[in-house]
């Protein structure tokens, strides 16, 4: 039972997302339609291999602690933790891990982290999306697809060597 859909699905699962390119029956990414899951996986792998995601992460982390949203969230969490710990009556028999886990659950359930992270993203990541990240991603994708198209174009067949060129006609006198 060798149907082409099964072969295609198997090819996707073990496809060239590991970074190999060239021969071996791999699909030419330039021939895949936009939005194809295999094409997306190949592009993401290419962006990772170029270090773009690491570069974006470093760029954002270098900027995050200067933003008011981060400073505000940090202050809120500090105050929340202080208030929570002030309500605890300390004794040497306390299980510190249980106390820590209870505190962690309280912080998460308060919703302040989710809201604070959303504000940090809007102050740090969003301004960089269209002017920094998108152009770099688009350039990398275009270069990747152009390189794949170049690999996929076969070389023109060589001139046959065994044949003599046609003899010139002797009509002109």
Curated annotation (Swiss-Prot):
Q: Which UniProt keywords apply?
A: Cell cycle, Cell division, Centromere, Chromosome, Cytoplasm, Cytoskeleton, Kinetochore, Mitosis
A Gene Ontology cellular component where this protein is annotated is: outer kinetochore
Location of region: Disordered: 1-32, 148-173
Q: Which InterPro entries match?
A: BOD1/SHG1_dom, BOD1L1
Q: Composition bias, kind Gly residues: at what positions?
A: 16-25
GO-annotated biological processes: cell division; mitotic metaphase chromosome alignment; mitotic sister chromatid biorientation; mitotic sister chromatid cohesion, centromeric; protein localization to chromosome, centromeric region
What intrachain disulfides are recorded?
none
Q: Which Pfam families match?
A: COMPASS-Shg1
Keyword Cell division in annotation: yes
The UniProt GO MF terms for this protein read:
protein phosphatase 2A binding; protein phosphatase inhibitor activity
- List the biased-composition ranges (Pro residues): 154-173
Compositional bias, Low complexity, is annotated for: 1-15
The listed locations are:
Cytoplasm, Cytoskeleton, Microtubule organizing center, Centrosome; Chromosome, Centromere, Kinetochore
The protein's job, in short, is: Required for proper chromosome biorientation through the detection or correction of syntelic attachments in mitotic spindles.
The similarity comment for this entry is: Belongs to the BOD1 family.
Assembly: Component of the SET1B complex composed of the catalytic subunit SETD1B, WDR5, WDR82, RBBP5, ASH2L/ASH2, CXXC1/CFP1, HCFC1, DPY30 homotrimer and BOD1.
**Name this polypeptide is given:** Biorientation of chromosomes in cell division protein 1
This chain's source organism reads: Rattus norvegicus
């Amino acid at each position: 039972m060798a149907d082409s859909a099964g072969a295609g699905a198997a090819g996707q699962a073990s496809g060239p997302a590991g970074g190999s390119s060239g021969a071996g029956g791999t699909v030419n990414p330039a021939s895949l339609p936009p939005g194809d899951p295999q094409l997306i996986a190949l592009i993401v792998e290419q962006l990772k291999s170029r270090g773009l995601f690491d570069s974006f992460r470093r760029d954002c982390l270098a900027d995050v602690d200067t933003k008011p949203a981060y400073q505000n969230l940090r202050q809120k969490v500090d105050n929340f933790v202080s208030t929570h710990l002030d309500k605890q009556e300390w004794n040497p028999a306390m299980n510190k891990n249980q106390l820590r886990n209870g505190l962690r659950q309280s912080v998460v359930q308060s919703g302040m982290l989710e809201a604070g992270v959303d504000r940090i993203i809007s102050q740090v990541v969003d301004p960089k999306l269209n002017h920094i990240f998108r152009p770099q991603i688009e350039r990398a994708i275009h270069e990747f697809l152009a390189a794949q198209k170049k690999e996929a174009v076969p070389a023109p067949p060589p001139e046959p060597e065994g044949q003599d060129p046609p003899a010139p006609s002797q009509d002109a006198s």
